[in-house]
């Protein structure tokens, strides 16, 4: 009777499941903390009554909420960034059989920065015109994107991708990720002109799409030449 083939198992501590669960938890907590730091109306003069008319209360509350515009913008931007990084992380771990030591090590700064992001988000939300606030937020996000990119790069180099994964397509995604990270870190030079640097940050998705099309076009050209 023929013996069944032995399935190769990941080395102890290198299985992706526990890292994925822990990463999901850290990102979920970080994304929740983002909204907690947005200032809330607490003064009694936001309520009609006690000498405050309904019209006055509405006006005061509206002005208070409008004054928090930079905080809401920072919240949406940071939430979107965390969601993108988490989504790419999810896609990566659907394509690997195990984790290399380098990939595990890179999760320390990745999760450290993800958990830290609510702090610079709060600072930039309160002081959007301060270059120090813009500089800190740019560094935190840039570091987070760099860690994500390096994890993807190590997955490709360390031979942990599943057999059916298109290596060329995966390499293209890594290249795009490097370009986006470089673009974000390049906005450090614009930090002095805060809050105008916010415009550059909102263009990140557009830069990613342009880079993706350029990389794909170049890969197809190389195929034709080969």
Indicate where each model-derived feature is located.
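Multi-pass alpha-helical transmembrane bundle typical of ion/small-solute transporters
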Residues: 2-226
């Amino acid at each position: 009777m023929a013996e069944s083939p032995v399935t190769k198992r990941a080395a102890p501590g290198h299985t992706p499941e526990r890292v994925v669960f822990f990463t999901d938890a850290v990102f979920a907590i970080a994304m929740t903390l983002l909204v907690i730091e947005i200032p809330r109306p607490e003064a009694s003069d936001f309520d009609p009554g006690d000498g405050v008319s309904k019209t006055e209360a509405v006006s005061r509350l509206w002005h208070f909420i409008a004054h928090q515009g930079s905080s809401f913008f920072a919240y949406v931007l940071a939430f979107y960034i965390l969601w993108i990084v988490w989504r790419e992380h999810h896609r990566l771990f659907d394509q690997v059989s195990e984790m290399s030591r380098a990939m595990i090590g890179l999760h320390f700064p990745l999760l450290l920065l993800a958990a830290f992001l609510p702090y610079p988000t709060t600072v930039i939300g309160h002081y959007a015109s301060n270059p120090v606030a813009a500089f800190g937020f740019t560094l935190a996000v840039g570091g987070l994107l760099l860690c994500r990119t390096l994890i993807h790069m190590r997955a490709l180099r360390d031979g942990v991708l599943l057999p059916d994964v298109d290596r060329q397509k995966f390499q293209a995604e890594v290249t795009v990720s490097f370009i986006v990270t470089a673009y974000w870190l390049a906005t450090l030079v614009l930090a002095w002109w805060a809050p105008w640097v916010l415009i550059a940050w909102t263009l990140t998705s557009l830069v990613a799409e342009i880079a993706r099309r350029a990389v794909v076009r170049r890969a197809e050209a190389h195929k034709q030449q080969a």
